[in-house]
Protein backbone atom coordinates (compact mmCIF):
# COMPACT_ATOMS: atom_id res chain seq x y z
CA UNK A 1 0.00 0.00 0.00
CA UNK A 2 2.81 2.38 0.95
CA UNK A 3 4.41 2.12 -2.47
CA UNK A 4 1.15 2.91 -4.30
CA UNK A 5 0.62 5.83 -1.91
CA UNK A 6 4.15 7.09 -2.60
CA UNK A 7 3.77 6.78 -6.38
CA UNK A 8 0.39 8.50 -6.30
CA UNK A 9 1.76 11.29 -4.12
CA UNK A 10 4.72 11.61 -6.45
CA UNK A 11 2.42 11.82 -9.48
CA UNK A 12 0.49 14.58 -7.81
CA UNK A 13 3.58 16.45 -6.65
CA UNK A 14 4.79 16.40 -10.26
CA UNK A 15 1.78 18.44 -11.30
CA UNK A 16 2.36 22.10 -11.89
CA UNK A 17 -0.09 23.14 -9.24
CA UNK A 18 -0.30 26.81 -8.42
CA UNK A 19 -1.51 28.34 -5.17
CA UNK A 20 -5.17 28.42 -6.24
CA UNK A 21 -5.39 24.68 -5.81
CA UNK A 22 -3.52 24.39 -2.53
CA UNK A 23 -6.56 24.63 -0.31
CA UNK A 24 -8.29 21.76 -2.05
CA UNK A 25 -5.34 19.41 -2.21
CA UNK A 26 -5.05 18.07 1.35
CA UNK A 27 -8.40 16.28 1.05
CA UNK A 28 -7.33 14.67 -2.21
CA UNK A 29 -3.79 13.96 -1.04
CA UNK A 30 -5.01 12.01 2.00
CA UNK A 31 -7.16 9.80 -0.24
CA UNK A 32 -4.67 9.14 -3.04
CA UNK A 33 -3.79 5.65 -1.82
CA UNK A 34 -7.39 4.60 -2.58
CA UNK A 35 -7.01 5.41 -6.27
CA UNK A 36 -5.71 3.38 -9.20
CA UNK A 37 -3.03 4.92 -11.46
CA UNK A 38 -5.77 5.67 -14.04
CA UNK A 39 -7.82 7.47 -11.39
CA UNK A 40 -4.77 9.49 -10.34
CA UNK A 41 -4.39 10.51 -14.01
CA UNK A 42 -8.02 11.66 -14.03
CA UNK A 43 -7.43 13.66 -10.82
CA UNK A 44 -4.46 15.26 -12.53
CA UNK A 45 -6.59 16.19 -15.56
CA UNK A 46 -9.27 17.74 -13.33
CA UNK A 47 -6.70 19.84 -11.44
CA UNK A 48 -5.05 21.00 -14.65
CA UNK A 49 -8.51 22.03 -15.87
CA UNK A 50 -9.13 24.17 -12.77
CA UNK A 51 -11.60 21.78 -11.14
CA UNK A 52 -10.00 21.47 -7.67
CA UNK A 53 -13.31 22.53 -6.04
CA UNK A 54 -14.62 19.02 -6.75
CA UNK A 55 -12.38 17.69 -3.94
CA UNK A 56 -13.03 20.40 -1.35
CA UNK A 57 -15.69 18.40 0.50
CA UNK A 58 -13.95 15.03 0.44
CA UNK A 59 -13.98 13.16 3.77
CA UNK A 60 -11.05 11.51 5.55
CA UNK A 61 -9.87 8.10 4.26
CA UNK A 62 -12.15 5.36 5.56
CA UNK A 63 -15.26 7.53 5.13
CA UNK A 64 -17.27 7.29 1.87
CA UNK A 65 -14.40 5.45 0.14
CA UNK A 66 -16.73 3.64 -2.28
CA UNK A 67 -18.35 6.97 -3.21
CA UNK A 68 -14.90 8.42 -3.98
CA UNK A 69 -14.15 5.54 -6.35
CA UNK A 70 -17.61 5.90 -7.92
CA UNK A 71 -16.79 9.59 -8.51
CA UNK A 72 -13.83 8.58 -10.67
CA UNK A 73 -15.95 5.97 -12.49
CA UNK A 74 -18.26 8.84 -13.44
CA UNK A 75 -15.34 11.09 -14.46
CA UNK A 76 -13.92 8.27 -16.61
CA UNK A 77 -17.30 7.89 -18.33
CA UNK A 78 -17.65 11.64 -18.95
CA UNK A 79 -14.08 11.75 -20.27
CA UNK A 80 -14.41 8.78 -22.65
CA UNK A 81 -17.88 9.53 -24.04
CA UNK A 82 -17.04 13.04 -25.33
CA UNK A 83 -14.86 13.54 -28.43
CA UNK A 84 -11.53 14.88 -27.10
CA UNK A 85 -12.47 14.17 -23.48
CA UNK A 86 -13.21 16.55 -20.61
CA UNK A 87 -10.31 18.83 -21.60
CA UNK A 88 -11.99 19.48 -24.94
CA UNK A 89 -15.43 19.88 -23.30
CA UNK A 90 -14.18 22.48 -20.80
CA UNK A 91 -12.12 24.38 -23.39
CA UNK A 92 -15.12 24.59 -25.74
CA UNK A 93 -17.38 25.60 -22.83
CA UNK A 94 -15.07 28.46 -21.78
CA UNK A 95 -15.03 29.81 -25.33
CA UNK A 96 -18.82 29.60 -25.75
CA UNK A 97 -19.50 31.04 -22.29
CA UNK A 98 -17.16 33.98 -23.01
CA UNK A 99 -18.98 34.61 -26.32
CA UNK A 100 -22.33 34.41 -24.54
CA UNK A 101 -21.23 36.88 -21.84
CA UNK A 102 -20.04 39.33 -24.50
CA UNK A 103 -23.31 38.86 -26.40
CA UNK A 104 -21.48 37.68 -29.52
CA UNK A 105 -23.77 36.81 -32.42
CA UNK A 106 -22.87 33.43 -33.96
CA UNK A 107 -24.11 34.79 -37.31
CA UNK A 108 -21.81 37.83 -37.42
CA UNK A 109 -20.28 38.13 -40.88
CA UNK A 110 -22.87 35.84 -42.49
CA UNK A 111 -25.44 36.87 -45.10
CA UNK A 112 -28.50 34.63 -45.52
CA UNK A 113 -29.91 33.55 -48.88
CA UNK A 114 -32.37 30.92 -50.09
CA UNK A 115 -30.63 27.58 -50.76
CA UNK A 116 -31.42 25.27 -53.65
CA UNK A 117 -33.69 22.30 -53.15
CA UNK A 118 -36.54 20.28 -54.59
CA UNK A 119 -40.17 21.28 -53.99
CA UNK A 120 -42.48 18.31 -54.53
CA UNK A 121 -46.23 18.10 -55.11
CA UNK A 122 -47.72 14.88 -53.79
CA UNK A 123 -48.96 12.54 -56.49
CA UNK A 124 -47.74 14.33 -59.64
CA UNK A 125 -45.47 12.64 -62.21
CA UNK A 126 -42.28 14.07 -60.74
CA UNK A 127 -43.26 12.91 -57.24
CA UNK A 128 -44.11 9.40 -58.47
CA UNK A 129 -40.79 9.20 -60.30
CA UNK A 130 -38.83 10.27 -57.18
CA UNK A 131 -40.81 7.77 -55.07
CA UNK A 132 -39.92 4.94 -57.44
CA UNK A 133 -36.22 5.90 -57.34
CA UNK A 134 -36.36 6.12 -53.53
CA UNK A 135 -37.82 2.64 -53.14
CA UNK A 136 -35.05 1.26 -55.38
CA UNK A 137 -32.43 2.98 -53.18
CA UNK A 138 -33.97 1.87 -49.87
CA UNK A 139 -32.10 -1.45 -49.78
CA UNK A 140 -28.89 0.61 -49.68
CA UNK A 141 -30.04 2.68 -46.69
CA UNK A 142 -29.76 2.48 -42.90
CA UNK A 143 -32.36 4.09 -40.66
CA UNK A 144 -31.49 5.88 -37.41
CA UNK A 145 -34.23 6.76 -34.92
CA UNK A 146 -33.29 9.39 -32.35
CA UNK A 147 -35.37 8.35 -29.34
CA UNK A 148 -33.82 9.64 -26.13
CA UNK A 149 -36.97 11.32 -24.82
CA UNK A 150 -39.73 10.49 -22.37
CA UNK A 151 -43.32 11.58 -22.94
CA UNK A 152 -43.52 13.77 -19.82
CA UNK A 153 -44.05 16.95 -21.84
CA UNK A 154 -47.05 15.17 -23.42
CA UNK A 155 -48.58 14.15 -20.10
CA UNK A 156 -47.49 10.56 -20.76
CA UNK A 157 -45.10 8.74 -18.45
CA UNK A 158 -43.82 6.14 -20.90
CA UNK A 159 -41.21 6.42 -23.62
CA UNK A 160 -42.48 8.42 -26.56
CA UNK A 161 -42.00 5.64 -29.13
CA UNK A 162 -44.39 3.40 -27.13
CA UNK A 163 -47.22 5.91 -27.55
CA UNK A 164 -49.91 4.85 -30.07
CA UNK A 165 -49.59 6.91 -33.25
CA UNK A 166 -53.33 6.34 -33.69
CA UNK A 167 -55.90 4.46 -31.60
CA UNK A 168 -57.98 2.88 -34.39
CA UNK A 169 -55.43 0.05 -34.46
CA UNK A 170 -53.37 1.05 -31.39
CA UNK A 171 -50.14 0.87 -33.40
CA UNK A 172 -47.34 2.59 -31.48
CA UNK A 173 -44.78 4.84 -33.18
CA UNK A 174 -41.97 2.28 -32.97
CA UNK A 175 -44.09 -0.47 -34.52
CA UNK A 176 -45.19 1.87 -37.31
CA UNK A 177 -41.58 2.84 -38.09
CA UNK A 178 -40.34 -0.75 -38.10
CA UNK A 179 -43.21 -1.91 -40.33
CA UNK A 180 -42.41 0.87 -42.81
CA UNK A 181 -38.73 -0.14 -42.90
CA UNK A 182 -39.71 -3.80 -43.43
CA UNK A 183 -42.11 -2.81 -46.22
CA UNK A 184 -39.38 -0.68 -47.86
CA UNK A 185 -36.95 -3.59 -47.64
CA UNK A 186 -39.40 -5.98 -49.27
CA UNK A 187 -40.36 -3.57 -52.07
CA UNK A 188 -36.75 -2.55 -52.74
CA UNK A 189 -35.48 -6.14 -52.83
CA UNK A 190 -38.36 -7.11 -55.12
CA UNK A 191 -37.37 -4.40 -57.62
CA UNK A 192 -33.74 -5.56 -57.41
CA UNK A 193 -34.78 -9.18 -57.96
CA UNK A 194 -33.33 -10.49 -54.70
CA UNK A 195 -34.51 -11.15 -51.16
CA UNK A 196 -31.52 -11.29 -48.84
CA UNK A 197 -30.68 -7.64 -48.09
CA UNK A 198 -31.60 -6.48 -44.58
CA UNK A 199 -32.02 -2.78 -43.78
CA UNK A 200 -30.16 -1.81 -40.57
CA UNK A 201 -32.24 -0.02 -37.94
CA UNK A 202 -30.48 1.93 -35.17
CA UNK A 203 -32.16 3.51 -32.16
CA UNK A 204 -30.36 6.13 -30.09
CA UNK A 205 -31.57 5.82 -26.50
CA UNK A 206 -30.70 7.56 -23.23
CA UNK A 207 -30.56 6.55 -19.56
CA UNK A 208 -34.23 7.53 -19.44
CA UNK A 209 -35.38 5.36 -22.34
CA UNK A 210 -32.89 2.52 -22.89
CA UNK A 211 -34.31 -0.24 -20.68
CA UNK A 212 -37.91 0.49 -21.66
CA UNK A 213 -37.02 0.53 -25.36
CA UNK A 214 -35.40 -2.91 -25.02
CA UNK A 215 -38.50 -4.16 -23.15
CA UNK A 216 -40.85 -2.78 -25.83
CA UNK A 217 -38.87 -4.51 -28.60
CA UNK A 218 -38.43 -7.82 -26.80
CA UNK A 219 -42.02 -8.10 -25.60
CA UNK A 220 -43.24 -7.55 -29.19
CA UNK A 221 -40.70 -9.81 -30.95
CA UNK A 222 -39.07 -6.69 -32.43
CA UNK A 223 -42.32 -6.02 -34.35
CA UNK A 224 -41.27 -8.51 -37.02
CA UNK A 225 -37.68 -7.36 -37.49
CA UNK A 226 -34.76 -9.69 -36.91
CA UNK A 227 -33.13 -8.73 -33.59
CA UNK A 228 -29.77 -8.70 -35.42
CA UNK A 229 -31.05 -5.85 -37.64
CA UNK A 230 -31.70 -3.60 -34.64
CA UNK A 231 -28.87 -1.85 -32.78
CA UNK A 232 -29.36 0.37 -29.74
CA UNK A 233 -26.78 3.08 -29.01
CA UNK A 234 -27.12 4.76 -25.63
CA UNK A 235 -26.16 8.40 -25.30
CA UNK A 236 -24.42 9.59 -22.12
CA UNK A 237 -25.12 12.88 -20.41
CA UNK A 238 -22.56 15.70 -20.15
CA UNK A 239 -21.23 17.61 -17.16
CA UNK A 240 -23.05 20.71 -15.95
CA UNK A 241 -21.21 24.02 -15.61
CA UNK A 242 -21.54 26.36 -12.63
CA UNK A 243 -19.97 29.58 -13.92
CA UNK A 244 -18.23 31.39 -16.78
CA UNK A 245 -14.96 29.61 -15.89
CA UNK A 246 -16.70 26.31 -16.72
CA UNK A 247 -16.27 24.93 -13.22
CA UNK A 248 -18.05 21.57 -13.18
CA UNK A 249 -21.18 21.57 -11.02
CA UNK A 250 -21.33 19.26 -8.00
CA UNK A 251 -24.54 17.22 -7.90
CA UNK A 252 -26.80 18.86 -5.27
CA UNK A 253 -27.80 15.39 -4.00
CA UNK A 254 -24.32 13.85 -3.75
CA UNK A 255 -21.03 15.70 -3.19
CA UNK A 256 -19.15 12.81 -4.85
CA UNK A 257 -20.93 13.25 -8.18
CA UNK A 258 -20.79 15.81 -10.97
CA UNK A 259 -24.22 17.06 -11.99
CA UNK A 260 -25.10 15.96 -15.54
CA UNK A 261 -27.77 16.77 -18.12
CA UNK A 262 -28.55 15.59 -21.67
CA UNK A 263 -26.26 16.90 -24.41
CA UNK A 264 -28.89 16.85 -27.17
CA UNK A 265 -29.65 14.64 -30.18
CA UNK A 266 -26.50 15.80 -31.98
CA UNK A 267 -24.75 13.00 -30.04
CA UNK A 268 -26.08 10.52 -32.58
CA UNK A 269 -23.20 11.32 -34.95
CA UNK A 270 -20.43 10.63 -32.40
CA UNK A 271 -22.20 7.43 -31.28
CA UNK A 272 -22.44 6.14 -34.85
CA UNK A 273 -18.79 7.00 -35.44
CA UNK A 274 -17.50 5.27 -32.30
CA UNK A 275 -19.76 2.22 -32.78
CA UNK A 276 -17.99 1.16 -35.98
CA UNK A 277 -21.37 0.68 -37.70
CA UNK A 278 -20.68 3.23 -40.46
CA UNK A 279 -17.63 1.33 -41.74
CA UNK A 280 -19.57 -1.95 -41.64
CA UNK A 281 -22.39 -0.41 -43.65
CA UNK A 282 -19.99 1.07 -46.17
CA UNK A 283 -18.27 -2.31 -46.62
CA UNK A 284 -21.71 -3.89 -47.15
CA UNK A 285 -22.42 -1.48 -50.03
CA UNK A 286 -24.82 0.88 -48.27
CA UNK A 287 -25.13 4.44 -49.60
CA UNK A 288 -27.50 6.33 -47.32
CA UNK A 289 -28.19 7.04 -43.65
CA UNK A 290 -31.64 8.39 -42.77
CA UNK A 291 -32.18 10.14 -39.44
CA UNK A 292 -35.60 10.74 -37.94
CA UNK A 293 -37.19 11.67 -34.61
CA UNK A 294 -39.52 9.85 -32.34
CA UNK A 295 -43.12 11.04 -32.79
CA UNK A 296 -44.02 12.03 -36.35
CA UNK A 297 -46.61 9.58 -37.63
CA UNK A 298 -46.43 10.89 -41.20
CA UNK A 299 -42.73 10.96 -41.91
CA UNK A 300 -42.45 7.67 -43.81
CA UNK A 301 -44.96 8.95 -46.36
CA UNK A 302 -42.26 11.47 -47.29
CA UNK A 303 -39.23 9.19 -47.17
CA UNK A 304 -39.36 7.30 -50.51
CA UNK A 305 -39.61 10.51 -52.58
CA UNK A 306 -36.98 12.32 -50.46
CA UNK A 307 -34.55 9.42 -50.82
CA UNK A 308 -35.24 9.54 -54.56
CA UNK A 309 -34.29 13.23 -54.56
CA UNK A 310 -31.03 12.47 -52.70
CA UNK A 311 -30.10 9.80 -55.25
CA UNK A 312 -31.12 11.84 -58.31
CA UNK A 313 -29.54 15.12 -57.18
CA UNK A 314 -26.55 13.34 -55.57
CA UNK A 315 -27.00 15.32 -52.34
CA UNK A 316 -24.50 14.69 -49.54
CA UNK A 317 -27.07 16.14 -47.13
CA UNK A 318 -30.81 16.35 -47.78
CA UNK A 319 -33.05 17.95 -45.15
CA UNK A 320 -36.73 17.11 -45.30
CA UNK A 321 -38.75 20.28 -45.04
CA UNK A 322 -42.28 21.66 -45.20
CA UNK A 323 -43.64 24.99 -46.44
CA UNK A 324 -43.20 27.52 -43.64
CA UNK A 325 -45.13 30.69 -42.93
CA UNK A 326 -42.93 33.71 -42.19
CA UNK A 327 -42.08 33.93 -38.46
CA UNK A 328 -43.68 30.50 -37.83
CA UNK A 329 -42.08 28.79 -34.79
CA UNK A 330 -40.06 26.30 -36.83
CA UNK A 331 -36.46 26.67 -38.01
CA UNK A 332 -35.80 27.77 -41.59
CA UNK A 333 -33.31 26.07 -43.91
CA UNK A 334 -30.94 28.82 -45.00
CA UNK A 335 -27.73 29.30 -46.96
CA UNK A 336 -25.27 31.41 -44.97
CA UNK A 337 -22.32 33.03 -46.76
CA UNK A 338 -19.52 34.58 -44.71
CA UNK A 339 -17.48 37.63 -45.69
CA UNK A 340 -14.42 35.33 -45.70
CA UNK A 341 -15.99 33.18 -48.44
CA UNK A 342 -17.22 30.29 -46.29
CA UNK A 343 -20.77 29.13 -46.92
CA UNK A 344 -23.08 26.50 -45.48
CA UNK A 345 -26.69 25.38 -45.69
CA UNK A 346 -28.14 24.89 -42.21
CA UNK A 347 -31.20 25.21 -40.05
CA UNK A 348 -31.54 28.70 -38.52
CA UNK A 349 -33.96 28.86 -35.59
CA UNK A 350 -37.02 31.02 -36.31
CA UNK A 351 -36.20 33.54 -33.54
CA UNK A 352 -32.76 34.09 -35.11
CA UNK A 353 -33.80 34.14 -38.78
CA UNK A 354 -35.91 37.31 -38.74
CA UNK A 355 -33.31 39.53 -36.96
CA UNK A 356 -30.55 38.04 -39.16
CA UNK A 357 -32.44 39.00 -42.33
CA UNK A 358 -33.19 42.51 -41.02
CA UNK A 359 -29.51 43.02 -40.17
CA UNK A 360 -28.29 41.96 -43.63
CA UNK A 361 -30.22 44.05 -46.13
CA UNK A 362 -33.74 42.59 -45.85
CA UNK A 363 -35.57 45.46 -44.08
CA UNK A 364 -38.84 43.49 -43.76
CA UNK A 365 -37.12 40.43 -42.30
CA UNK A 366 -38.78 37.05 -42.73
CA UNK A 367 -41.83 37.63 -44.96
CA UNK A 368 -44.02 35.45 -47.16
CA UNK A 369 -43.41 35.60 -50.91
CA UNK A 370 -45.96 35.27 -53.73
CA UNK A 371 -46.58 31.61 -52.80
CA UNK A 372 -47.96 32.72 -49.42
CA UNK A 373 -45.00 31.09 -47.64
CA UNK A 374 -41.54 32.15 -46.50
CA UNK A 375 -38.85 31.36 -49.10
CA UNK A 376 -36.94 29.62 -46.27
CA UNK A 377 -38.53 26.17 -45.90
CA UNK A 378 -39.34 24.72 -42.47
CA UNK A 379 -36.89 22.19 -41.06
CA UNK A 380 -38.57 19.04 -39.68
CA UNK A 381 -35.39 17.34 -38.44
CA UNK A 382 -35.36 14.39 -40.81
CA UNK A 383 -32.00 14.11 -42.59
CA UNK A 384 -30.69 11.91 -45.38
CA UNK A 385 -26.88 11.72 -45.51
CA UNK A 386 -24.74 10.13 -48.22
CA UNK A 387 -22.67 7.53 -46.38
CA UNK A 388 -19.29 7.96 -48.10
CA UNK A 389 -19.04 11.71 -47.51
CA UNK A 390 -20.50 11.25 -44.01
CA UNK A 391 -17.70 8.84 -43.03
CA UNK A 392 -15.12 11.19 -44.57
CA UNK A 393 -16.43 14.11 -42.49
CA UNK A 394 -16.69 12.13 -39.25
CA UNK A 395 -13.14 10.85 -39.62
CA UNK A 396 -12.11 14.53 -39.24
CA UNK A 397 -14.53 15.44 -36.43
CA UNK A 398 -15.10 12.08 -34.63
CA UNK A 399 -18.76 13.02 -34.83
CA UNK A 400 -18.41 16.21 -32.77
CA UNK A 401 -21.13 18.70 -33.69
CA UNK A 402 -20.90 22.48 -33.31
CA UNK A 403 -22.29 23.16 -29.84
CA UNK A 404 -24.07 26.04 -28.17
CA UNK A 405 -24.63 27.10 -24.57
CA UNK A 406 -27.71 28.76 -23.15
CA UNK A 407 -26.98 30.00 -19.60
CA UNK A 408 -29.73 31.69 -17.59
CA UNK A 409 -27.95 34.64 -15.96
CA UNK A 410 -28.92 36.02 -12.54
CA UNK A 411 -28.58 39.65 -13.68
CA UNK A 412 -27.28 41.96 -16.40
CA UNK A 413 -23.65 41.59 -15.29
CA UNK A 414 -23.77 38.03 -16.67
CA UNK A 415 -21.31 36.89 -14.00
CA UNK A 416 -23.42 34.18 -12.35
CA UNK A 417 -26.10 31.71 -13.41
CA UNK A 418 -29.55 31.07 -11.91
CA UNK A 419 -28.81 27.35 -12.25
CA UNK A 420 -26.10 25.24 -13.83
CA UNK A 421 -25.88 25.08 -17.63
CA UNK A 422 -24.25 22.65 -20.10
CA UNK A 423 -23.17 22.43 -23.70
CA UNK A 424 -25.82 21.23 -26.15
CA UNK A 425 -25.78 20.05 -29.74
CA UNK A 426 -28.37 19.30 -32.41
CA UNK A 427 -28.40 16.55 -35.01
CA UNK A 428 -29.32 18.99 -37.80
CA UNK A 429 -26.20 21.12 -37.20
CA UNK A 430 -24.04 18.44 -38.82
CA UNK A 431 -23.57 20.54 -42.04
CA UNK A 432 -21.87 23.38 -40.10
CA UNK A 433 -18.45 21.76 -40.44
CA UNK A 434 -18.81 20.68 -44.09
CA UNK A 435 -16.59 22.15 -46.84
CA UNK A 436 -18.23 24.55 -49.35
CA UNK A 437 -18.00 21.82 -52.01
CA UNK A 438 -20.52 19.65 -50.09
CA UNK A 439 -23.82 19.23 -51.92
CA UNK A 440 -26.39 20.25 -49.31
CA UNK A 441 -30.02 20.55 -50.35
CA UNK A 442 -33.56 20.07 -49.14
CA UNK A 443 -36.80 18.40 -50.17
CA UNK A 444 -40.04 20.25 -49.45
CA UNK A 445 -43.31 18.39 -49.15
CA UNK A 446 -46.74 19.55 -48.03
CA UNK A 447 -47.17 19.52 -44.26
CA UNK A 448 -50.27 17.30 -44.52
CA UNK A 449 -48.21 14.46 -45.95
CA UNK A 450 -44.93 14.83 -44.03
CA UNK A 451 -45.18 16.48 -40.63
CA UNK A 452 -47.39 15.97 -37.59
CA UNK A 453 -45.17 15.82 -34.50
CA UNK A 454 -46.61 14.91 -31.11
CA UNK A 455 -44.89 17.05 -28.51
CA UNK A 456 -47.39 19.20 -26.56
CA UNK A 457 -49.61 18.22 -23.64
CA UNK A 458 -53.37 18.99 -23.77
CA UNK A 459 -53.12 22.15 -21.62
CA UNK A 460 -50.36 23.71 -23.73
CA UNK A 461 -52.02 22.64 -26.99
CA UNK A 462 -55.32 24.24 -25.98
CA UNK A 463 -53.49 27.59 -25.56
CA UNK A 464 -52.11 27.54 -29.13
CA UNK A 465 -53.65 30.43 -31.15
CA UNK A 466 -56.35 29.31 -33.58
CA UNK A 467 -54.96 28.37 -36.97
CA UNK A 468 -51.54 27.34 -35.61
CA UNK A 469 -50.64 23.65 -35.32
CA UNK A 470 -51.34 22.01 -31.94
CA UNK A 471 -48.61 19.34 -32.24
CA UNK A 472 -50.47 17.23 -29.66
CA UNK A 473 -51.51 13.58 -29.49
CA UNK A 474 -54.96 14.73 -30.66
CA UNK A 475 -53.73 16.61 -33.73
CA UNK A 476 -51.11 13.95 -34.49
CA UNK A 477 -53.71 11.20 -34.72
CA UNK A 478 -56.13 13.35 -36.74
CA UNK A 479 -53.28 14.21 -39.15
CA UNK A 480 -52.79 10.51 -39.94
CA UNK A 481 -56.48 10.14 -40.88
CA UNK A 482 -56.36 13.35 -42.88
CA UNK A 483 -53.27 12.27 -44.83
CA UNK A 484 -54.68 8.82 -45.58
CA UNK A 485 -58.02 10.33 -46.64
CA UNK A 486 -56.31 12.84 -48.96
CA UNK A 487 -54.07 10.14 -50.46
CA UNK A 488 -57.14 7.98 -51.25
CA UNK A 489 -58.90 11.05 -52.67
CA UNK A 490 -55.96 11.65 -55.01
CA UNK A 491 -56.15 7.98 -55.97
CA UNK A 492 -59.78 8.43 -57.04
CA UNK A 493 -61.82 7.49 -53.95
CA UNK A 494 -64.71 9.80 -53.03
CA UNK A 495 -63.74 10.51 -49.42
CA UNK A 496 -66.20 12.68 -47.51
CA UNK A 497 -65.18 16.08 -46.16
CA UNK A 498 -64.13 16.21 -42.51
CA UNK A 499 -66.27 17.43 -39.63
CA UNK A 500 -65.01 19.88 -37.00
CA UNK A 501 -64.89 18.59 -33.43
CA UNK A 502 -63.30 19.80 -30.19
CA UNK A 503 -61.24 17.43 -28.02
CA UNK A 504 -59.22 18.60 -25.00
CA UNK A 505 -59.97 22.20 -25.98
CA UNK A 506 -58.54 21.77 -29.50
CA UNK A 507 -60.69 22.25 -32.57
CA UNK A 508 -59.66 19.60 -35.11
CA UNK A 509 -60.80 18.25 -38.47
CA UNK A 510 -62.07 14.70 -38.06
CA UNK A 511 -61.69 12.77 -41.31
CA UNK A 512 -62.82 9.17 -41.84
CA UNK A 513 -60.53 6.97 -39.72
CA UNK A 514 -58.55 5.33 -42.51
CA UNK A 515 -55.41 3.31 -41.75
CA UNK A 516 -53.38 0.72 -43.60
CA UNK A 517 -50.28 -1.36 -43.00
CA UNK A 518 -47.23 0.08 -44.83
CA UNK A 519 -46.94 -3.07 -46.97
CA UNK A 520 -50.35 -2.26 -48.50
CA UNK A 521 -49.47 1.23 -49.67
CA UNK A 522 -45.86 2.32 -49.50
CA UNK A 523 -46.03 4.67 -52.50
CA UNK A 524 -48.75 6.60 -54.26
CA UNK A 525 -48.51 4.56 -57.47
CA UNK A 526 -48.90 1.33 -55.49
CA UNK A 527 -52.01 2.66 -53.70
CA UNK A 528 -53.49 3.87 -56.99
CA UNK A 529 -53.02 0.42 -58.54
CA UNK A 530 -55.15 -1.15 -55.78
CA UNK A 531 -58.22 1.06 -56.30
CA UNK A 532 -60.70 0.50 -59.10
CA UNK A 533 -64.13 1.71 -60.07
CA UNK A 534 -66.31 4.01 -58.05
CA UNK A 535 -65.31 3.90 -54.35
CA UNK A 536 -66.75 6.13 -51.64
CA UNK A 537 -66.22 6.54 -47.88
CA UNK A 538 -68.64 8.44 -45.62
CA UNK A 539 -67.49 10.90 -42.93
CA UNK A 540 -68.29 8.57 -40.00
CA UNK A 541 -66.48 5.58 -41.50
CA UNK A 542 -63.45 3.61 -40.36
CA UNK A 543 -61.37 1.55 -42.82
CA UNK A 544 -58.52 -0.66 -41.60
CA UNK A 545 -56.44 -2.55 -44.18
CA UNK A 546 -54.16 -5.24 -42.73
CA UNK A 547 -52.76 -7.06 -45.71
CA UNK A 548 -50.65 -6.52 -48.80
CA UNK A 549 -52.79 -7.66 -51.73
CA UNK A 550 -56.07 -5.95 -50.87
CA UNK A 551 -57.94 -4.36 -53.78
CA UNK A 552 -60.84 -1.91 -53.44
CA UNK A 553 -63.40 -1.99 -56.24
CA UNK A 554 -66.70 -0.08 -56.29
CA UNK A 555 -66.68 -0.02 -52.49
CA UNK A 556 -69.32 2.08 -50.76
CA UNK A 557 -68.39 2.31 -47.07
CA UNK A 558 -70.63 3.78 -44.39
CA UNK A 559 -69.53 2.31 -41.07
CA UNK A 560 -66.48 0.26 -40.07
CA UNK A 561 -64.67 -2.26 -42.27
CA UNK A 562 -61.58 -4.23 -41.23
CA UNK A 563 -59.80 -6.22 -43.92
CA UNK A 564 -57.39 -8.92 -42.75
CA UNK A 565 -55.35 -10.75 -45.38
CA UNK A 566 -52.49 -13.24 -45.08
CA UNK A 567 -49.17 -12.46 -46.73
CA UNK A 568 -49.97 -13.94 -50.15
CA UNK A 569 -53.77 -13.89 -50.07
CA UNK A 570 -55.47 -11.62 -52.58
CA UNK A 571 -58.62 -9.97 -51.30
CA UNK A 572 -61.07 -7.98 -53.43
CA UNK A 573 -63.27 -5.66 -51.38
CA UNK A 574 -66.41 -4.73 -53.31
CA UNK A 575 -69.97 -3.59 -52.83
CA UNK A 576 -71.75 -1.77 -50.05
CA UNK A 577 -70.79 -1.94 -46.38
CA UNK A 578 -73.18 -0.31 -43.93
CA UNK A 579 -73.17 -0.72 -40.14
CA UNK A 580 -73.28 1.32 -36.92
CA UNK A 581 -69.51 1.60 -37.02
CA UNK A 582 -67.16 3.08 -34.43
CA UNK A 583 -67.66 6.47 -32.80
CA UNK A 584 -65.35 8.93 -31.07
CA UNK A 585 -66.34 9.53 -27.46
CA UNK A 586 -64.87 12.62 -25.75
CA UNK A 587 -62.87 12.09 -22.54
CA UNK A 588 -61.39 14.72 -20.24
CA UNK A 589 -57.59 14.72 -19.98
CA UNK A 590 -57.97 15.28 -16.22
CA UNK A 591 -59.95 12.03 -15.81
CA UNK A 592 -57.38 9.72 -14.20
CA UNK A 593 -59.66 6.68 -14.54
CA UNK A 594 -58.80 6.73 -18.26
CA UNK A 595 -55.35 5.45 -19.41
CA UNK A 596 -52.85 8.26 -20.09
CA UNK A 597 -52.36 7.43 -23.78
CA UNK A 598 -56.14 7.85 -24.31
CA UNK A 599 -56.84 10.88 -22.15
CA UNK A 600 -54.04 12.98 -23.68
CA UNK A 601 -56.03 12.68 -26.96
CA UNK A 602 -59.35 13.72 -25.45
CA UNK A 603 -61.31 10.87 -27.04
CA UNK A 604 -61.70 7.12 -26.98
CA UNK A 605 -63.03 4.92 -29.76
CA UNK A 606 -66.36 3.25 -29.01
CA UNK A 607 -66.42 0.09 -31.15
CA UNK A 608 -70.16 -0.43 -31.67
CA UNK A 609 -70.30 -2.51 -34.84
CA UNK A 610 -67.97 -3.49 -37.67
CA UNK A 611 -67.63 -5.85 -40.60
CA UNK A 612 -64.48 -7.95 -40.90
CA UNK A 613 -63.31 -9.54 -44.13
CA UNK A 614 -60.62 -12.19 -43.93
Curated annotation (Swiss-Prot):
Enzyme class: transferase
GO biological process: UDP-N-acetylglucosamine biosynthetic process
Superkingdom of origin: Eukaryota
Stored Pfam families: UDPGP (PF01704)
Signal peptide: none
Keyword Ribonucleoprotein tagged: no
GO MF annotations in UniProt: UDP-N-acetylglucosamine diphosphorylase activity; UTP-monosaccharide-1-phosphate uridylyltransferase activity
Reactions catalysed according to its record: a monosaccharide 1-phosphate + UTP + H(+) = a UDP-monosaccharide + diphosphate
Cofactor(s) the record lists: Mg(2+); Mn(2+)
EC number: 2.7.7.64
UniProt KW keywords: Nucleotidyltransferase, Transferase
Function in brief: May function as the terminal enzyme of the myo-inositol oxidation (MIO) pathway. May also play a role in the salvage pathway for synthesis of nucleotide sugars. Can convert galactose-1-phosphate into glucose-1-phosphate by carrying out both the Gal-1-P conversion to UDP-Gal and, following an epimerase step, the subsequent reverse reaction of UDP-Glc to Glc-1-P.
Stated family: Belongs to the USP family.
Name of this protein: UDP-sugar pyrophosphorylase
Gene it is expressed from: USP
Amino acid sequence: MASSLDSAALTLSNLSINGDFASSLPNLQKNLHLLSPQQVELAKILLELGQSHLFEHWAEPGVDDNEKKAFFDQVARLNSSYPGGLASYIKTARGLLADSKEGKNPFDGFTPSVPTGEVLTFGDDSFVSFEDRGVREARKAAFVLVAGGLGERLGYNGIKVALPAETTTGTCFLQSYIEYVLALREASNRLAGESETEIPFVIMTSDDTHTRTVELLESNSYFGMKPSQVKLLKQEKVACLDDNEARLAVDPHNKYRIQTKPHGHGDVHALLYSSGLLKNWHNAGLRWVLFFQDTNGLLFKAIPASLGVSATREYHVNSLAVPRKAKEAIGGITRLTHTDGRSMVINVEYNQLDPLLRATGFPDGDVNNETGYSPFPGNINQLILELGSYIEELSKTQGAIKEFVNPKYKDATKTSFKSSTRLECMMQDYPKTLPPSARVGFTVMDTWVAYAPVKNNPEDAAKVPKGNPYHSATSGEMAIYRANSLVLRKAGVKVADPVEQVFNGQEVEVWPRITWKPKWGLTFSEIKSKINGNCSISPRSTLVIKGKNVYLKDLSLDGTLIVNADEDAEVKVEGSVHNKGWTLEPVDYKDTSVPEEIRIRGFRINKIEQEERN
